[in-house]
Amino acid sequence: MKNNRILALSGNDIFSGGGLSADLATYTLNGLHGFVAVTCLTALTEKGFEVFPTDDTIFQHELDSLRDVEFGGIKIGLLPTVSVAEKALDFIKQRPGVPVVLDPVLVCKETHDVAVSELCQELIRFFPHV
């Protein structure tokens, strides 16, 4: 791979079994330079496993910070809200030649369902770009 810079649009898994921790570890093991824009945080609370979306403004600032980086690939993981998904889609649309992998999380292993009804419709909009 000529360009070894890979971007993960991923959530933070507090148990490090998935999300951005796993993405960055995989990139490192394969000699790639990983970048990340955090889509959400997670926590195990009295309510169970919870997903806390990154504030829209903060997520946009993350993407804006990466605007001038040329990536060899982009991997999309957990997109917790329609607005975060829209921002991610706008970002990848600006990079038409960059390979994109869409690996969405729709149901967390810990049995907490991420709100998916509107989000599924938004994810369909990614298909022409991945």
Label every PLM stretch briefly:
Residues 1-73:
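Small-residue (G/A/S/T)-rich helix-start motifs and N-terminal tracts that mark the onset
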Residues 76, 82-130:
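Conserved beta-alpha-beta core of the PfkB/ribokinase-like small-molecule kinase fold
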Residues 10, 78-79:
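Conserved residues at beta->alpha junctions
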